[in-house]
Amino acid sequence: MSNFKNFTLNSFEDYYGKPSETPKMEEEKLEVTNVNASSSKKVHKSKKSTSKYDQKNVFRNSMTGIAQILPTKPVKIIEQNIDFANPKSFDLLQSTHTICFNKRINTTNTKLNVETHTSSDIDNDILHVGAPTDLGGNSNDEAETRQLRKFRWSNNKEKSLCEKLTVIYWALLLHTTKRASKRRPILCHQMIAEFFNRVYKEKSRVPITSRYIRDNLVAWVTQGKELHEKGWVGDAKTGDLQEQFNIATVKLYESAEDGRLSIGKDKPFREENTGSDSLVRAEEDSTAVTNENGHISSEKNLKKDRRESIRNQILTLDLNDEDFFQNVMKVLSAIDEPELRQYVIVISELVSMEMDDGKTVREKLRDVELNINRLQVDIKEIKEMLVTLINK
């Protein structure tokens, strides 16, 4: 959670400055020098000077009141085995476009430091890798800096790393897409910002802005390019977040340079020449089996066997486990059926920037949300079915 919950009067005065008492002094001088001044002018002056500071008071009281409301449930980190030195570990990122992090690295049980740090600690400890990056601040736009609080990454180091890599991954992909970089770059940054704010939602944190992504995109590309040219190789076994961040940045840069995105395992495709039709065809081809006469005969049987296998995997899960839903999601993520993978296809359309079909960015994001919600409903029904089976 953002450090803004500790926002007090002192920090408010440090940020906005103390209320000046010059209006009172000016009023006394006016009384001495001009005794015959009308009382209406005095009242008008005092009201004007106080209202200016009162507005700041109202802002402080209202914003601290909102910020002090704690979320009902703590934010959980989805645990997933990701070894940044292994390209296959990026399957989860490449299929959902969000990074989930695992506390265990390789075979060691080294727990990463998840203590709460200040935003400045995060900026200095994790992100300074030699390139002139500014990943921990807000936009360079002065108007935004004056009017809004600064955007902060999560204070949880694990979650913070996931957030940064997710945004960099999206930004690099869209930056290397011809349609994104030449035709509608502003929409690209806005799309990343809106999707990020939906996935990593925190009540007391200022949403990330498209301006912030735009201002830092060049630095991210430069950072990955420099590390790539140096032949930088890190050791992920140490559990050092800085090294993992460097490894991941190189991997993301190489993936973006190739201009490809993998949906599932070992299914690369070019963004510029790929749409939803080719994705659906790829899934259909992977499930289709032909017999000696050249007819598709066993597709239904394969689907039935696969569903039975998935069902058996889910039945082995512990219903009382608090991570039951996450474990079910891991099982379902391996299914290639269109009804369960539809949300991946929709997100892929966003990445390929197919913006000319009359749909706006918001409408496409709404489609993503609806599909994800539908998947969650399916999981709920599966759990109810399992409860019924166990009771029998």
From Swiss-Prot:
Q: Please verify whether the record's keywords include Cytoplasm.
A: yes
Gene Ontology terms: cellular component: cytoplasm; nucleus
Any single GO BP term: nucleobase-containing compound metabolic process
Q: Where is the composition biased (Basic and acidic residues)?
A: 21-31
The region called Disordered is annotated at: 18-52, 284-303
Phosphoserine sites (modified residues) = 11, 139
In terms of domain of life, where is this protein from?
A: Eukaryota
Cellular compartments annotated? Cytoplasm; Nucleus
Q: Where is the signal peptide?
A: none
Polar residues biased stretches: 287-296
Chain intervals with Basic residues compositional bias: 41-50
Q: What else is known?
A: Present with 538 molecules/cell in log phase SD medium.
The name on file for this protein is Protein SRL2
Name the species this protein comes from: Saccharomyces cerevisiae (strain ATCC 204508 / S288c)
Give the source lineage, highest ranks first: Eukaryota, Fungi, Dikarya, Ascomycota, Saccharomycotina
